[in-house]
Design a protein with these regions (language model features):
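Short runs within selected transmembrane alpha-helices of multi-pass transporters and secretion channels
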Residues: 11, 15-19, 42-45, 49, ...
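Hydrophobic/aromatic end-of-helix segments at the C-terminal termini of transmembrane alpha-helices
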Residues: 18-26, 30, 59, 102-107
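Interhelical loop/hinge segments that connect adjacent transmembrane helices in multipass membrane
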Residues: 1-19, 62-79, 199-214, 268-272, ...
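Helix-loop junctions and terminal segments of transmembrane helices
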Residues: 41, 45-85, 89, 139-144
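Interfacial transmembrane-helix starts/ends
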Residues: 2-5, 55, 72-102, 119-125, ...
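Short membrane-interface helical motifs at transmembrane helix boundaries
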Residues: 94-113, 168, 172, 229, ...
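Membrane-proximal transmembrane or re-entrant/amphipathic helices at the cytosolic face
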Residues: 204-205, 228-288
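Interfacial/gating helices of multi-pass transporter permease domains
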Residues: 1-4, 24-46, 116-120
């Protein structure tokens, strides 16, 4: 148990180091203004990560039940990995696209003026962590199978790569440079090393996983075009325009994905959530 807990603890420590190393670099080589700008972007990325972790935590019991079985374990793990990954992709893509099109205004009202670079930093960090987040049920599987040691080692290497890349970039390009270095290290670690590890060690059919994820790309492209069109039509300068944009974009995102991307299981999940929402509205109306 001590061995098991140590590497979970090491994972947590290394992840925190990876997320905070840029602030140390910026403080050492650039200055406090760069730290403030970077911190806003990092904080927004932190919310992005927290949201994704909340979703995957729902499936921890299911993971433990599957791992405890011996028969057909690999098939069930693959099915769960793909199922949760698809759900994560749908939700996180929605959040990412909304931030892509509304993020500048949101930062201006949340942090104030003078933090334009924070928008680009947040985008880069979100892109860098995106693969890890849609696959983070894999972390729970590794822990359940007591195979998480290598992930800790991989992330120690990512920390070293992050440090080596980010220092010269931060010196030359400030907070943006530091974000580029971190993004590159995370994409290398999560996009290449961890996918190979999942494939080789816990027998995840990573090719089938990505085949499922790529089915969302046409819808993502359509929504990106729609978002750019809405940005030209709705100039987001007030909270009213901000809310109108979100409402229109959200409805269109649901329609496009419903018709072209999501499967019957995901449609049933949406129906259940909508029914719960309708029930709560009915209760509120009855009380009034």
């Amino acid at each position: 148990m001590g061995y098991f807990s140590f590497f979970i603890f090491l994972n947590m420590i290394v992840e925190q180091i990876n997320l905070s190393v840029d602030n140390f670099i910026l403080g050492r080589y650039v200055g406090t203004t760069a730290i403030a700008i970077y911190s806003i972007g990092m904080q927004l990325n932190g919310y992005f990560i927290t949201f994704a972790n909340t979703i995957s935590s729902v499936f921890i019991t299911k993971v433990n039940m599957i791992v405890a079985k011996n028969e057909n374990k690999d098939d069930e793990i693959n099915g769960l990995f793909i199922k949760v990954g698809r759900i994560q992709f749908i939700i996180l893509s929605y959040i990412f696209l909304l931030f892509l099109f509304c993020g500048r205004y949101f930062i201006s009202i949340w942090a104030g003026e003078g933090y334009n670079e924070s928008y680009y930093i947040a985008l880069m960090l979100m892109i860098a962590i995106f693969i890890d987040l849609i696959q983070n049920i894999g972390i729970k599987i590794l822990e359940a199978e007591n195979k998480h040691k290598m992930r800790s080692i991989i992330f120690v290497l990512i920390s070293c790569i992050n440090l080596l890349i980010s220092i010269p970039l931060a010196k030359n390009y400030g907070a943006i440079g530091a974000a580029v270095g971190t993004a590159a290290a995370f994409l290398l670690g999560n996009g290449l090393f961890m996918n190979l590890y999942y494939y080789k060690v816990i027998n995840i059919d990573i090719f089938v996983f990505w085949k499922n994820i790529f089915k969302f790309i046409p819808g993502l492209i359509i929504m990106s075009v729609i978002g750019m069109f809405l940005n030209n039509v709705i100039d987001i300068n007030t909270s009213t325009e901000f809310i109108i944009f979100i409402l229109i974009f959200s409805v269109l995102y649901l329609i496009i994905n419903w018709n072209f991307c999501i499967n019957s299981y995901e449609k049933n999940l949406i129906k259940v959530m909508l029914n719960k929402f309708k029930f709560k509205l009915k209760v509120v109306n009855d009380l009034n």
